[in-house]
Amino acid sequence: MSLKSSLYVGSVFHCRLAPKPHRFRYRLFWLLLDLGELPSLDRRLKVFSHNRHNLFSLFDRDHGDGGASTLRAQADWLLEAQGIDTGGGPIRLLCMPRTLGYGFNPISVYFCHHLDGALAALIYEVHNTFGERHRHVLAVANKGRAVRQACAKSLFVSPFLPMGLRYDFHVSSPGETLTVAIRASGPDGVVLRAALTAQRRDLTDANLLKAGFAFPVEAMKTTAAIHWEALRLWLKGVAYLRREGALGAPSPLHPAEMLRDRENVLVAASAEIHHHEMLPGPLGRELDHLGERVGGLERRDDAFEP
């Protein structure tokens, strides 16, 4: 039986337009996992596991509401609550896997299909570094491969972006290529553009290992990148906003508080990468070794350039 799940290799690009120009790009890989194939993938692949540790893994608790219900069941409930009927069609999750036990996804996307394969809806699951998540469930109105959708920002994700923003999504349905582009706009115009672009690969042990060697500890690099880029923005003089809660509007920090926070921003990149579930034996030692490598990335100006 041929798999519908795939591996995608590509890059993420961020371009901040206001209040200070700032951009970066780095290479990553993602898995597009058919939720109905997870038991089969767990049996067929040697280096990937579902809900158990391996070189690469997917843990249900890293997504959705973190509860005991399956990701498929949670997605179905969300769709039903929005009056979206897929007729039981496939749902595929685009995400980065845990690598050596560590995983962080700034955004995961559920592609929800009708039985005939047409897209019915997209679920955008946004994660922040405070451990919070919010899911935007948006129906697909058009029948083409390119999907355009929009929603209001609902989760505090960056101390350098206010809450009163609108997200515009431009997504291509997964094929040989994949694009997920996001534009964040406020009252004064566009403040941020970001895009994920990737090429499809078969999901095999060999391709997973190739991607893993090409982009080691990608999730740790992503977390380190978030804090490193935050530091660069702070050094450029962009106002640092205090988080007032999951849905609250952030307020600017007093300059003295910004100075006290500087050490926290510097330390966070290396500290975050050690916040993982310990693995036994060689895998645990390898993760610690890789963590030391990633811990130095915040000192390099070009650390996340291709």
Residue spans for each PLM region:
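Coiled-coil-like amphipathic alpha-helices with heptad-repeat character
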Residues: 22, 294-295
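Alpha-helix boundary/capping motif
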Residues: 273-278, 287-293, 299-303
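Intrinsically disordered and other compositionally biased segments
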Residues: 268, 277-281
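Mature, function-bearing regions of proteins
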Residues: 1-270, 306
